Every structure is written in structure tokens, then in C-alpha cells.
């Protein structure tokens, strides 16, 4: 779409949530221009109320701050497998964690690929912790066969059966 329109927009994919759902991030004025282009091409879009251009290059100042803070922390090897939302792969080298956390600020969240990777590696039960069911809904869009639980309060925790 953009090849025939403005090519210098700062609008980047921030989240690849599921088939047919991506989130864009960038300069407000550029996103507003992109919304017009999408509407002209009959592409459904919703402008989300967010406070910053998360997961895009405009977050470079926050990346620097995060790096300084993470450099003060000594991480220890954990017992559980971790999937990076930056790579959508399992983190095999424990020393990569800090770098991946830093990269996550300016790079897209590869949620769809992360979930597919987990399912392909025999994860069949997802638990969403916190208010709402947004992530559970995204997982269902990716694969309806997995078990999904949501934890919103103490009662939910007590009723959880793993």
C-alpha cells in the first residue's frame, strides 16, 4: 500500500498478534496519515489510546535507560524455559536475556510466532495472569485446541487446576 503513497512515514509493526491482527507504532502524525491510506484501501483499523510509541525505534531513549538499569542487575540461571518475544524462540543462552529485554523496547512483539513455537514444543495450557482476557483471546485466534485459563483474583488462583 505504501509503495504508491508516502514512503517516509515512521510507522513500524509493533505487535504481530495473530493472523489478521497487527499493531503499528510510530509518530502520531504519520500514523494518522497511514490510517487515511488504510481507510482508502478498505483495510480495517482501530486507533489505540496509548501513551508512547512502544516497540518501535522512537523508543531509543528508553532503551538506553533500560540498558543502564539492567546492567546493575545480576541475573541467575532459571529453571524454566523462556521464549523471547523479540525472536519468538527459546532463549538457549542465559546471557542473552538482558540484551533481549533491551531489544524488546524497540522491536516488534512476535506474539503469534511465540505462541506457535510454544504449541509446536508441546505447550498445550496457557495461563493469563492479570486483568482482562486479551492475550487469551489472541491465543484462541491462533489455536482453538489449547487450554486457556485466566487469573484475575485470588479466587481464580484457588480454583486453578494444572
Task: List the predicted regions and their residue ranges.
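Acyltransferase
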Residues: 1-140, 149-162
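Expand to "…catalyze enediolate/carbanion chemistry for C-C bond making/breaking, isomerization
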Residues: 143-144
Amino acid at each position: 500500500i505504501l509503495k504508491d503513497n508516502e514512503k517516509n512515514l515512521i510507522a513500524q509493526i509493533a505487535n504481530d498478534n495473530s493472523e489478521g491482527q497487527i499493531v503499528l507504532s510510530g509518530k502520531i502524525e504519520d500514523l494518522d496519515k497511514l490510517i487515511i491510506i488504510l481507510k482508502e484501501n478498505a483495510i480495517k483499523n482501530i486507533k489505540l489510546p496509548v501513551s508512547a510509541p512502544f516497540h518501535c525505534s522512537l523508543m531509543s531513549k528508553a532503551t538506553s535507560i533500560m540498558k543502564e538499569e539492567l546492567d546493575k542487575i545480576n541475573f541467575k540461571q532459571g529453571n524454566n524455559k523462556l521464549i523471547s518475544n523479540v525472536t519468538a524462540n527459546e532463549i538457549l543462552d542465559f546471557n542473552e536475556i538482558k540484551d533481549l529485554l533491551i531489544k524488546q523496547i524497540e522491536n516488534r512483539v512476535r506474539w503469534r510466532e511465540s505462541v506457535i513455537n510454544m504449541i509446536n514444543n508441546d505447550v498445550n495450557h496457557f495461563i493469563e495472569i492479570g486483568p482482562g482476557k486479551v492475550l487469551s483471546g489472541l491465543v484462541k485466534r491462533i489455536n482453538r485446541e489449547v487450554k486457556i485459563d485466566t487469573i484475575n483474583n485470588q479466587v481464580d488462583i484457588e480454583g486453578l487446576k494444572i
